[in-house]
Structure formats: structure tokens, C-alpha cells
Amino acid sequence: INGMLTLGCGQRIGLIAGSGVGKSVLLGMLTRFTKADVVVIGLIGERGREVQAFIQETLGEEGLQKSVVIAAPANVSPVLRLKATQMTHAIAEYFRDQGKNVLMLCDSLTRVAHAQREIGLAIGEPPTAKGYPPSVFALLPNLIERGGVGRHGFGSITAIYTILAEGDDASDPIVDIARASLDGQVMLSRKLADMAHYPAIDLNGSISRVMQNLLSPEDFRVANMLRRLWSSYQQNADLIQVGAYETGTNPELDMAMRLMPGIIHFLRQDMNSPQDLSATWDQLRQLLGGA
């Protein structure tokens, strides 16, 4: 994320994932290793056991020291789940208005949409795409727009919303509306998770829309170079693995094949190993020094 999907204070981003691809672990890493003053976490619609496991194991004492956790498990009423979501945003806004840089994690925006769907259908709203009533599509942009930089440039809410791609379906209507409202997305790949490549971030499907404003032109060029090499290798992986690719046919693919072990090492990170922005960029510049 630091190197290929650089985030800025006040950015709103979606973490799009199916089940079992390392979403909760990545959220725990973001919470424990962030430089934010306060972390506000809303666990909406999760299983009660997962809430306890996230707090005790994934966050741990280190993560809890500067965190506020609001939990509304799946067994509570949809009204309470919506109230917990509003409280998560209100607490984040309170700290932002004090001039603090806040990291807000909302897990998950999809469960918030489900809660609003239950309420909307119960009061007689007509179902539209995948059974979601119109109030869902009005609620989500309003929530997302509550993040960002505070008045007069003091304080910020950097918001990360997890979005469940049901059945790994990236064309889900909640995914679509979130993409339209957010400043980028981090897509987690089941294929990478099956290969024990963690964090299982799919570079081809992920983007940070403010990254160009945060980096120097040279650093932005280096990041795009790695993205092109990764994409080129993935598109031709089958040919390479069966030995059908002839070296020298495509110079960029030749470079990708030569650098791929280093690229894979760069893109992986142990869940207990923090790495700051400067160390990430030193490693990336060294990897692509001659590119």
C-alpha cells in the first residue's frame, strides 16, 4: 500500500474482498502500524466470535492503545447496526474536529447496506438492483462523504471501508456505488491468497486516485513501472510456465521475468513486521534502479 497504492490523509478508500482472503489481518496491520493519532473501528454485522477475535488477537494491546471500537454484531437489529455505523462516523468526526488525524475503519459497508435494505423493504420501499431499495444508494454516498480533511485544513479522517464482493463478484451494486464515491480501492485476490501471497492485493484491480499528488514524478514513474511489469508477467504466466515463451520476444516481459522474485518479495509482508514509507521506497528504488 505504501509503495503501489500510496494513501493520503483524508482519503476514502474501499477494501474489496471475498471471504477468507486476509481482510481482517490486513485491517489489523493497518491499525497497529499506522501513524494516525486515533483509530476508530466500526465492526458492523460481523459474527460475535469474530468481533472478539479481532479485538483480542488481531488488534492486541498494541492496537487498542489508540483505538476506539464500536461493534454491532450480526444478531442485533438492523436499526442498531445503522446506529453503530453513525456512531463510528460521529466519533471519528469528534477527533477530527480536535485537529487529530484519524484513521477510520468500517467493516463492512456491505453489512451496512444489508441493514438499510432490511429497513427499507420493511417500510415498503420498492426493491431495485439485487433487492436493494433506493434508500441504500442514497445512504452510502452520504456516509462516505463524511470523511476527508476538516474545516480550514485541520484534522482529517482517512476512511477505509471494507466491501464484501459476494461470491467474488466485483460487479455487485454495492461495489459499483462504492467505487463511484471513493478515492480508490484495494482489491484482494483469492488466487493470490490460495498461493499464500499475503497481503493478497491484486495490483491490476487496485488504484489510489490521489497517489499522483503525493509522490514526486520520478517515484510515480517507478511505481507505474512495477505495476506494468507485474501486469505483463500475469498476462503471460501460462506461456512462461509451460515453456512456450521465447526469451527476447518482449523486452518488458524479459525484465519482469528477471525481477519477479524480487517483486514478489517486495509485495509480501509478514503480519507482525511493520515497514514505514521511507523504507518501502528505498526498497522499491533499489529493486527497479536500472529500469
Regions found by a protein language model. Give the residues of each.
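P-loop NTPase catalytic core
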Residues: 3-6, 10-291
